[in-house]
A protein has these predicted regions:
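Core segments of cupin and vicinal oxygen chelate
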Residues: 32-36, 42-88, 123, 141
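Short secondary-structure boundary/capping segments
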Residues: 78-80, 96-99, 132
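Vicinal oxygen chelate
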Residues: 2-3, 18-46, 65-67, 86, 93-160, ...
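Acetyl-CoA-dependent GNAT
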Residues: 92-94, 155-156
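Bacterial N-terminal signal peptides
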Residues: 7-16
Length: 160
């Protein structure tokens, strides 16, 4: 009986703490333009071909023929008729694509309006690396986070 009473007091106190926390803490406001998802994960390898084969054979990541990367296909939650992709790629350890970052990885984030996001980031003092590049996949730009990691921002064309 005593155990039940202690558990009830603890549960009531915990519940009240959540209620109080919910009433006193504001969720941080989100910026107008923001990341909408992960567009890709890229990392360096000493032997990219062998590593890609390992991931394909052991974990089932289907590597695109001749491209050297894998694609994960999914549907948008708000509109299930719209498909999206997340790219998985292995780069040679000598690649300069991740520069100026010294990190052996780079994450690509999907965005809705790249130009507006870059304006917002520049206004906030974020280091923007170079100009916007556009190709058949969409628009790309790069920023550097406070720890020096290069981040790729991607506004995909429809169907990506």
């Amino acid at each position: 009986m005593r155990t039940i009473a202690i558990a009830a007091v603890f549960a009531a106190g915990f519940g009240a703490g959540i209620l109080v926390a919910g009433q006193t803490q504001q969720a941080p406001s989100l910026p107008a333009e923001r990341v909408t998802g992960i567009g890709g994960v890229f990392f360096k390898a000493r032997d990219p071909k062998t590593l890609r084969t390992w991931y394909q054979e052991k974990l089932g990541i289907a590597i695109q023929e001749g491209a050297g990367f894998g694609l994960f296909l999914w549907r948008e939650r708000q509109d299930s008729s719209r498909e999206g992709t997340t790219v998985w790629g292995v780069f040679p350890e000598t690649t300069k694509y991740f520069a100026p970052s010294a990190a052996p990885f780079m994450i690509n984030y999907r965005v809705r309006n790249l130009e507006a996001l870059l304006t917002q980031l520049r206004s906030a003092g974020v280091t923007v690396d170079g100009k916007v590049v556009e190709d058949f996949n969409g628009k790309f730009a790069w920023v550097v986070d406070p720890e020096g990691n290069k981040i790729e921002l991607w506004e995909p064309k429809p169907g990506y």
